[in-house]
Amino acid sequence: MFKNPAELADRVLAGTPVTPDEALDLLRTDDPGMLDLVAAAARLRREHFGMTVKVNYLVNLKSGLCAEDCGYCSQRLNAGTDILKYSWLSPEQAVEQAEYGIKGGASRVCLVASGRGPSNREVGNVTRTVEALKEQHPDVEVCACLGLLKDGQAESLSSAGVNAYNHNLNTAESHYESICSTHTYQDRVDTVERAKDAGLSPCSGLIVGMRETDEQLVEAVFALRDLGSDSVPVNFLMPFEGTPLAGTWQLSPQKCLKILAVVRFVCPDKEIRMAGGREMHLRSLQPLALHVVNSLFLGDYLTSEGQAAEADLAMIADAGFTVLGAGPDPSRDRHAGPADVQGSGAEQGAGERTTTPCGSVCGSAAGSSSGDGSAPDGGRAPADVSRSGPAEAVGSSPEDGSRNAGGPARTRSAAASSAPTGAGMSPALAALLGSDDGPEQDEDDTRVRVELSPTVRRRGAGTSVAPNA
């Protein structure tokens, strides 16, 4: 046991790793001790990464129509979610989207596709995209996230210039059957190992807030350490309407900070990324989280909106950090004053622009079998993307793309009542949601819980509207 986080940080810096019991104690730090925990984790962050922040940018190559049954995912085929659905972007379309993030300061582009895993033909489409991107931007890192890999596919990606492969474990092995029944935890581990064997940098992380216990969260973090993940994205569950986990709210900004700090203590020298859901769950504590993490995604996510890129860059600069590979001011000439930054301040704190970890941004293997939803020629995305619900012009104006898709705030009871009760849900997840076996809540926790609907992405890839990068 340890007396305080600072002493434990001293020990970690001296080369002695934390134990699971110590990590559990850190996770259960009371709120008055939270700043001491963050300060100790910040020492570990600065030791290995200084005051830099790595900026990553997502390009959603194929959206929705996924046959896997991951309980958190808005891209599952039978989810009643109102997301964009489209087939594979062409290499030219994908490079065009990547350009937005690169101009915004991203040093890594993440190419993501929904689906259980790619066919060899689809891997060929991705390699052509990577080659085209690297021809124009040879120094930009490329991370692929395509689901479960077959023999030889990781080698093909590596030969084309892919630097890293993302496939999240998402949760603890002891909790996995409660989240998904169409593939196993070991399937995910095997894909990460295939990527490593091919020389790709392994990227694997978590989705927190899926009714896991504190013990299971610690179990998952240590599994990521043992897996040897170079990059650990931490997603915060966004309970999309129409998914089995709709109405699941167990995170507060303070709890999110504690989770990030625990990941830093367990993986002190790894890239830790605050990923999907940070805007909704960390809210006004995002700048403080930068003292623990050293990486984030810029702009929108796969199926939902993120904080405006200008607000992200201003947040990084205001907190005293610099974007990795950029000058001293990461937002450069784009760094407007507070009144000029769109989507920042109280608007962001209110959760109006929110995100969800869904589909493959989480490194998910969730998705349709190879080829589901693909265009006949295997390459071109249709001009008009489809979406569930009534037909509506997508991208008629930037305002339409950023404001009209989200819907008003929901109370906890309303959100919970809208959750599915069986259809398309694994038996283990149905049992968990119908039981009292979820994480215990503090009886004295009187904080106001903010619960808002995610805002569905209507811009960027698959639309005619520019992204918010």
From Swiss-Prot:
Q: Which residues does the record give as [4Fe-4S] cluster binding sites?
A: C66, C70, C73
Output the InterPro entries linked to this UniProt entry: Aldolase_TIM (IPR013785), BATS_dom (IPR010722), Biotin_synth/BioAB (IPR002684), Elp3/MiaA/NifB-like_rSAM (IPR006638), rSAM (IPR007197)
Assigned keywords, A-Z: 2Fe-2S, 4Fe-4S, Biotin biosynthesis, Iron, Iron-sulfur, Metal-binding, S-adenosyl-L-methionine, Transferase
- The EC number of this protein is 2.8.1.6
GO biological process, alphabetically ordered: biotin biosynthetic process
For the Radical SAM core domain, which residue ranges apply?
A: 51-278
Q: Which residues bind [2Fe-2S] cluster?
A: C110, C143, C203, R273
Enzyme class label: transferase
Names of required cofactors? [4Fe-4S] cluster; [2Fe-2S] cluster
Q: Where is the composition biased (Low complexity)?
A: 363-384, 405-428
| Note accompanying the cofactor annotation | Binds 1 [4Fe-4S] cluster. The cluster is coordinated with 3 cysteines and an exchangeable S-adenosyl-L-methionine.
In the UniProt record, does the keyword 4Fe-4S occur? yes
Name the cystine pairs: none
Reaction equations catalysed: (4R,5S)-dethiobiotin + (sulfur carrier)-SH + 2 reduced [2Fe-2S]-[ferredoxin] + 2 S-adenosyl-L-methionine = (sulfur carrier)-H + biotin + 2 5'-deoxyadenosine + 2 L-methionine + 2 oxidized [2Fe-2S]-[ferredoxin]
Pathway in which the depicted protein is active = Cofactor biosynthesis; biotin biosynthesis; biotin from 7,8-diaminononanoate: step 2/2
Has the keyword Iron-sulfur been applied to this entry? yes
Give the span(s) annotated as Disordered.
326-469
State a single Gene Ontology molecular function. Answer: iron ion binding
Record SMART domains? BATS, Elp3
Domain of life of the source: Bacteria
Q: Which PANTHER family match?
A: BIOTIN SYNTHASE (PTHR22976), BIOTIN SYNTHASE, MITOCHONDRIAL (PTHR22976:SF2)
**Assembly with partners or alone:** Homodimer.
What's this chain's function? Catalyzes the conversion of dethiobiotin (DTB) to biotin by the insertion of a sulfur atom into dethiobiotin via a radical-based mechanism.
Which family does the similarity line name? Belongs to the radical SAM superfamily. Biotin synthase family.
Question: What is this protein identified as?
Answer: Biotin synthase
Source species, please? Kocuria rhizophila (strain ATCC 9341 / DSM 348 / NBRC 103217 / DC2201)
